[in-house]
Curated annotation (Swiss-Prot):
Annotated GO CC locations: cytosol
InterPro entries: Trm112-like (IPR005651)
Coiled-coil intervals: none
Record protein name field: UPF0434 protein RPD_0454
Similarity comment text for this entry: Belongs to the UPF0434 family.
SUPFAM superfamilies membership: Trm112p-like
Matching Gene3D superfamilies: 2.20.25.10
């Protein structure tokens, strides 16, 4: 059961995910539903999704270990 304080898990449209690529490597992205991020394994960056909009700016991305 979801309470009003919990944010329901959203998903990224499959077609959008097929179109979007990492702006650094031009490689594919993976959707992380728990963190609401698009992951670029090649660039080791996680691009945030805010209000359903992917923020595809390298300076906004979280660096992965």
């Amino acid at each position: 059961m979801t309470t009003s304080s919990e944010r329901p898990e959203t998903s990224v449209d499959r077609k959008l995910l097929e179109i979007l690529v990492c702006p650094v490597t031009k490689g594919p992205l993976e959707f992380d539903a728990a963190r609401q991020e698009l992951i670029s394994r090649g660039a080791k960056l996680a691009y945030p999704i805010r209000d359903g909009i992917p923020i595809m700016l390298p300076e906004e991305a979280r660096k992965l270990g």
